[in-house]
């Protein structure tokens, strides 16, 4: 490989070519993570609650984490979302409209001992779930 005065064109060409060997570069440029993401790259999304589900915690913990299955309004995809807070699941009923966000796991993945759950609920019918759990606000009737 040339390193002379006029070798710049070849060096740039080779760099562009070998860039594609880098897996992270290829995924970023082809936007593969965005295409696979149910939220389509957005930070938040709204959905309709289909059912309440209990997800068993991974070893060594023993618990049933309260989650919900929701169908996203924007694209119809179904996902599972975690309901954080003591008794938070009691404020969520079927057919409610919830707003979700990422749960905060590494590289957009799941968090802690909840397997396969990448999202969490933070609003129910446009009211903060945290405020409802704390008793500051009541759940509105839709």
UniProtKB/Swiss-Prot annotation:
One of its GO terms (cellular component) is small ribosomal subunit. Keywords: Ribonucleoprotein, Ribosomal protein, RNA-binding, rRNA-binding. PROSITE patterns: RIBOSOMAL_S12 (PS00055). GO terms for biological process: translation. Gene3D superfamilies: Nucleic acid-binding proteins. One of its GO terms (molecular function) is rRNA binding. With S4 and S5 plays an important role in translational accuracy. Located at the interface of the 30S and 50S subunits. Belongs to the universal ribosomal protein uS12 family. Part of the 30S ribosomal subunit. This is Small ribosomal subunit protein uS12. It comes from Methanocella arvoryzae (strain DSM 22066 / NBRC 105507 / MRE50).
């Amino acid at each position: 490989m040339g390193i002379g005065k006029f070798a710049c064109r070849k060096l740039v060409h080779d760099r562009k070519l070998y860039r594609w060997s880098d897996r992270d570069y290829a995924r970023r440029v082809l936007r593969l993570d965005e295409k696979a993401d149910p939220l389509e790259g957005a930070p938040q999304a709204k959905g309709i609650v289909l059912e309440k589900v209990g997800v068993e915690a991974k070893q060594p913990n023993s618990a049933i984490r309260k989650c919900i299955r929701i169908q996203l309004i924007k694209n119809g995809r179904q996902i599972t979302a975690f309901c954080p807070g003591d008794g938070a699941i009691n404020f969520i009923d079927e057919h409610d409209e919830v707003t979700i966000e990422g749960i905060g796991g590494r590289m957009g993945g799941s968090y802690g001992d909840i397997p396969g759950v990448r999202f969490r609920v933070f609003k129910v019918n446009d009211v903060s779930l945290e405020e409802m759990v704390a008793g500051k606000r009541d759940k509105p009737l839709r």
